């Protein structure tokens, strides 16, 4: 599962997510009519960097290999599928080739329509040949990350994996799009 060490991948920091409630939500915002289930794992509060791994040679249209949220600087020594923990949100279903990572607390003051409007204002300013991602802020304090994981419409499900350090503590969350190709 050492995707970040593969010779054909490169890592880019695409932002950070603030966890203030101890719970995180990860979903494709566009096909939704309501906010989805949160991840059940209770997390430490803090600001955590979000990394994007993509193919570097040759570049691919849907070149994202994985998205990783880093909770601790320690390296994972083992990975577990989220469904192993009977988490109700054990995978990432995406239809519109995008994803959104945030603390669940933002949904107290947002609707899915207002969230999509915010994303549209920022995401439409990108260069068409670039992978798109952006950092969003709510109430000038809660940071969230939006990204596109391909071009066009898909109906796919990918696994969410929790990474654990040598103290058996959660240190990473990995959304694995294409690592089976490496």
Q: Residue locations for each model-derived region?
A:
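Intrinsically disordered, low-complexity acidic regions enriched in Pro/Ser/Thr
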Residues: 1-182
């Amino acid at each position: 599962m050492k995707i970040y060490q593969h010779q054909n991948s490169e890592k880019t920091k695409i932002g950070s997510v603030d966890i203030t409630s101890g719970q995180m939500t990860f979903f494709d915002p566009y096909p939704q009519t309501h906010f989805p289930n949160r991840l059940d794992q209770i997390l430490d509060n803090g600001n955590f960097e979000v990394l994007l791994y993509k193919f570097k040679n040759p570049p691919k249209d849907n070149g994202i290999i994985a998205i990783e949220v880093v909770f601790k600087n320690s390296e994972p020594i083992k990975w577990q599928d989220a469904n192993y923990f009977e988490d109700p949100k054990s995978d990432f279903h995406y239809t519109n080739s995008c994803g959104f990572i945030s603390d669940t607390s933002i949904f107290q003051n947002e609707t899915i329509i207002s969230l999509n409007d915010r994303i549209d204002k920022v995401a439409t300013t990108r260069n068409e040949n670039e992978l798109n991602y952006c950092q969003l802020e709510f109430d000038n304090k809660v940071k969230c990350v939006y990204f596109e994981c391909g071009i066009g419409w898909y109906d796919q499900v990918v696994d969410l994996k929790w990474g654990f350090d040598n103290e058996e503590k959660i240190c990473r969350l990995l959304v694995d799009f294409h690592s089976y190709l490496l």
